[in-house]
Structure formats: structure tokens, C-alpha cells
Amino acid sequence: MDTTKNNDEFDISYFLTCSIFGFILWILTEQILKYYNKTNKNNKYNLPKGPSFLKWFINYLFNFYDLKLSNNKEEDNNNNNNKSNNSLSQEELIEDTSENTVLKWFNQLNSDNYSVSFFGRPMIFTRDTTISKYILSSNNIDNYTKPPDSSGVLIRLAQNSILMSEGDQWRYHRSIINQPFSSKNVKLMIPTIITTINKLINHLNNNNNNNNNNNNNNNNNNNNNNNNNNNNNNNNNNNNNNNNNNNNNNNNNNNNNNTIIIDIHSYCTKLTFDIIGKLSIGYDFNSIESSDNDNDNNDDDDISKQFDFILNEMIRPIRRFSSYLPLYNDIKLFKFLNELESIIKGAINSRSLITDNNNNKTYKKNFLLDNLLDDNVKEKDIIGNINTFLLAGHETSANLLTFIFYLLSTHNNVQNDLYNHLIENQKKKINKDNKFTEEDEDYQSIEFLDWVIYETLRLFPPAPMIGRTSKNDDILKSGNNNNNNNNNISIPSETLILISVYAIHRDPKLWKDPNIFNPYRWKNIENINNRSDFIPFSSGGRVCVGQKFSIVEARIIISKLILNFELSFNNLKSKPFKIYQRATLTPKYPVFLNFKKRENK
């Protein structure tokens, strides 16, 4: 019995029912607001123009479910010949999904701001850096708070944490979370990161060797089978069988080139999840080792895939009705959340016993949990913050690494330049015995490596949208013309403001050739951490507490993999490269890359 199909049909029926109910409610609400607006009570507000809610929502819904083909705009490449040779590739990186959702209304309205009325509540989308800087500033932490969780998933996952708290409660959580992510502690995390990435490299090498051995055995078996078949088949059939077998072997693994084909997003997700588990609660989820059995394993038993399911649930449109109607996926969702909570509680209990007898002669590997236990934080707050760390720490890092390796695989000149910089850095660290040790590696001294990371963060920011809710009436001063009051935006309290980091990073007014992957542009960019046009980790008082860790982790993983493997994009196996937005920006389909072992390794 195909239960998957039945489940999908059941879910769609719920969706249609809720959509009809929501549409009727929306019509009634709009009629009430139409009458209310006649009293002129809202005339004092000067909201930017935008599409109707129905038009906006249908556009979002169709793109979410891929119910229509995307319409790519033909980009003008007449000036490509005038661009720097360091641009490497003139391929525009405007993805289908982003062009039809994130960037669509900014482009159509030719404006940095537009508004949508969501059941009478104004939503303002902005890529205005002056407005975003104002809203995210430390002075406005209490005036502009995070919007409520409409899906109900985050409330269950991280209610008592730095992610969902506000005011004094947020300041309390921030104070206890800051210490584990200090520069000193992040440096102490490096050995765990190196150990885990080495485990992945060994895993890939072993898979490559095993595939080579299996293919050799298959070839021998095929030869034997062909000899037996000679009695019954003609020579042409035997030759066809040989060709088919050889083609299958070549598709699975290019033995002559020591190449293995992997879904890079899947591997990066498992890698970062194992790293986060070890650093946060001292728990090895062993996701990397389970990669061999992906086809045999039930997704319900894979903790990294459980988190993937949870993240997908957060952005499903039907989730907005979960407070009123039970959903079929609630059973699986709450099961996964309970299992994760049990793991964390077990880690808390076991770690409490260990830390009671800790002689403090060695650094603590479980940086987050140890710090929370030392500060006598309540168990529910520990669970909330650990969940936040697991969620944000592995998902954003995995997506960033996936985008980096994808871009490197499609821009060979950048990949070669990066490899040469890494080799040159190693030569500088060779010791007296003419040997290089990992302890000698300085992951902060490779400037070009940081350029690659920054450029990827610009094109694919982990958090593509930052939401804030105004607590009071306010006036937002537009950066286009601050001296013209007509361009300012008057907003009522409870206005939802969505800052499009993705659109800011792709704004042609701020970035030259914004859709071109060009790491060399960062050579002349200064004061990177204080720019209003580059905010991949947000900005102001609620800037991402783990950004230092994220950059250090990326430096190590990229360096290790590029030094060991040459990457290329597998056009035959991969679907078109598309992105979609859930809590983070993530690839829509698996991204298959060829990992060719370098000859000097």
C-alpha cells in the first residue's frame, strides 16, 4: 500500500478546506475594514503601494508548490566583455524561485518598499538599508520585536530561548549565550570541527575505494556471465551487455578518475549536525556514518532528516491554521520534537554527573551545555537554547557550505585560485622537519577564502528575511530621499516589517553586477562587519550570536575538502539549481557534485 500518496492526498484536502475557510474570512475582514476606513481613522498613515493580499498570496502559494513554471527574465549581457576577468563567469545567478517571489514586487513596483494588507494588518516588505538599519538598531530592540510564530512549531521547539524571547528575558538569554561563542571559546572548538571533517573525508575515501573494488568484482562477474551467455546468445548481445554494464558502472562512479558522486547538501547537513551535537551537548549523532545506508534507513530514524521535516513544517501554508485545526503531520511532528527533547534531557543528566567531578584541567567540549549548567539555568531554558543552537547552527551552516561548494564547482577558476592559496598557506606553515601539521594551520590568514565565504553570503544569505513587529506608531525614513517627508512611511502599531536581506544583497543600486559570483570584489571592501548593505547575520543588538563560529567552521571545512578533492557539478544527475525560503534559504533539490580525489593526496 502506498501510504505516502494517501498522506499527501489527506494533507491537500485539509489545505483546500482551510484555504476556502480562510478566503471567506478574508472577504469578510476586507469588507469590515473598507467600512472602517471610511471613518478616516487610518488616513494619517502613509503606507507604500503594493499588490493585494490575494494576488500576493496566490503568487507565493503557486511558487511554494511549484504549480507554475517560473519566468526567467533575459538579462542584458552586452556589457559582459567589459567586466573584469576575475568575474570568471557571466552566468547570472537569479534563481527561478527568487525572481518570482523575493524580488518580483520590488522590480515590478520599482520601489524599495511595498505593503500588503494581511487580514487588515499591514505588512511592509523593504530592501531600504536606511529603514533596515533603523529597525535593527540596538536602540529599537524593544520597539521592534520578532513577529509571533504563526506555524506553532517554533513555540514548541524553542519557546524558552534566545530565539523567541523579548525584553529582559531576551537580555538574560543573551548574557548566558554570549560566553560560549566568545573568540576564545570558538578557537577551542576547532579540534572538534577538524576531527569531524576528517571523519567525513575518510568516509568519502572509503566509499570511493569500496566502489572501485565492487566495480572490479562486478566486471569479473560480468565477464563470467558473458562467457556463460556465449552458449545461448550471439556476440552482438554479449557486446551490448558489456556496454550496458560498463555504462552503469561509469554512471555510479568514475573509477579512472577516482571520482565519487554525492549529494553535497545531504552530506553538509549531516556533517554540521554531528559537529553541533558534539559541541553543544557532547552527543555524536553519527549522521555521517549513516550516509551509507540512506536508502535503507527510515527517515524517522535519522535525526538530521527529522530536523529537515521540522523546518519544512514551519513554512507550509497550511500551518497557519494549525491553531484551529489538527493536522495530519502533527503526529510525526510532535513525535520528533519529543525524541529530540529526550536526547537533550539525557545529555543534561549525564553531563551534570561529569561536571560535578571535573578537575578543569582540560577544556570543556560541550561549550553551550556546560555554560548553561554552570549558570544554573532552568531545564526548560536549557532545552530551548540547545534546540535553537541545533536548529540555527546546523541548518544555516549546511546551506552556506552547500552554496559555496556549488559555486566553486561551477566556477573552476575560483576553485583553482582558492586551492592555490590554500597550498601556499600550507607551505608557509611547514615546520623544521619539513612536515605540516594541522595545529600549524592558521584559518584566519587566508584572505581569499574569506572573500569566497563573503560573496556566497551575499548571494545566498542564510536568513533571507528578517521580520519585526512595531510596538508603537512610528515614521520610517526612506533612504532614497530623507529630506522629502512624502517618501517617509507612517506605520501603525503591530505593523509587520519584513526586511529582505536577499533583495538588499542583490540590489543593483548597492552592488555592481549583483547577480554575478565574483569573490574578487571584496578586495576593496572595508569594514565588512559594519555595512548596512551586507547583513547576512542580521545587525544591531540581535545580530547572530554564532556568526564567529559559523565563519570559523566554514573556513575549516572548505579548506579541508578543497585540499583533498576537486569539485565539479554533475549536470546529468542534478535537477536545475533552485532555492526556496523556509526558516532559511535552502536548495530546493539535491545538489549532486563530482568529488575527484586530488593526485597529491
From Swiss-Prot:
It is found in: Membrane. GO terms for cellular component: membrane. Its cofactor is heme. Keywords: Heme, Iron, Membrane, Metal-binding, Monooxygenase, Oxidoreductase, Transmembrane, Transmembrane helix. Its EC number is 1.14.-.-. Its main location: membrane. The chain crosses the membrane at residues 12-32. One of its GO terms (molecular function) is heme binding. Heme binds at C544. It is a single-pass membrane protein. Residues 205-253 are annotated as: Disordered. Belongs to the cytochrome P450 family. This is Probable cytochrome P450 525A1. It comes from Dictyostelium discoideum (Social amoeba). The gene is cyp525A1.
